[in-house]
């Protein structure tokens, strides 16, 4: 059954958001709108700088190199997915113009204009492709589905797959598709997807494998979300806060430990 979907995009050039938009349409769903954060704002710069200037600059350089690399091996996992699924790389606005999808470009996902945009479109569900923290007002307007790059409920927060490696909990590496709530990574879990490690895998390659799996797993979970939203979310989907822990950005020494543990 077709759902009325809003895609929340991190940036104009977000490969994840573009893949979610295109694949939702291929699966027969209606993408009724896109909410996108404006790239150059003081608020966004402050958010990006919370991990430090070096991390911020490294992120920019990595994104540029991945985007303009002609090699599948050097692209992000999302870029690889686009290429192997014949999705032309272009801006979110360009794709929306082709499909006549309205776009709301906003300073914050929680702005009044974003809330009004959602209310006028009456969507069934929003898919989160990044763009910052989501507050209660937006969550009260529409259910929002997110893909967490770790297995919930145990690993919440930042870099959960690296923390699983640091702790040598290899069976806790994977993706979790969940509905969002204001408490970070604590919404009902729709689906857990373990990811198997490969021989001689690097941290970079593991992250790419996780990224590559995100788009198809999110699209597959739409049917689960639709079923639960039409009926009732089973009790077993709800997380207990004490079943997991909130993790933060790991120190470089711990990242090196994760890489070492990956090769064991």
Which sequence ranges carry the predicted segments?
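One-carbon transfer enzymes
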Residues: 1-264
């Amino acid at each position: 059954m077709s759902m009325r979907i809003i895609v929340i995009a991190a940036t104009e050039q977000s490969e994840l958001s573009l893949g979610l938009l295109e694949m939702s349409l291929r699966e027969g769903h209606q993408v009724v709108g896109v909410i996108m954060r404006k790239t150059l704002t003081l608020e966004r710069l402050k958010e990006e700088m919370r991990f430090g200037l070096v991390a911020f600059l490294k992120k920019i350089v990595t994104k540029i190199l991945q985007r303009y690399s002609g090699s599948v091996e050097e692209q992000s996992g999302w870029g690889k997915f686009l290429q192997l699924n014949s999705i032309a790389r272009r801006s979110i606005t360009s794709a929306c113009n082709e499909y006549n999808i309205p776009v709301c470009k906003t300073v914050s996902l929680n702005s009044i204009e974003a809330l009004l945009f959602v209310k006028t479109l009456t969507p069934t569900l929003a898919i989160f492709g990044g763009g910052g923290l989501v507050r209660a007002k937006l969550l009260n307007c529409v259910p929002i589905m997110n893909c967490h790059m770790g297995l919930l409920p145990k690993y919440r927060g930042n870099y959960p797959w690296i923390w699983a490696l640091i702790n040598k909990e290899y069976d806790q590496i994977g993706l979790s598709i969940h509905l969002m709530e204001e408490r970070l990574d604590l919404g009902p879990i729709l689906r857990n997807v373990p990811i198997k490690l490969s021989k001689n895998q690097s941290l970079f390659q593991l992250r790419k494998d996780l990224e590559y799996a995100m788009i198809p797993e999110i699209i597959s979970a739409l049917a689960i979300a639709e079923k639960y939203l039409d009926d009732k979310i089973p009790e077993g989907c709800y997380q207990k806060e004490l079943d997991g822990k909130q993790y933060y950005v790991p120190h470089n020494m711990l990242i090196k430990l994760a890489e070492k543990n990956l090769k064991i």
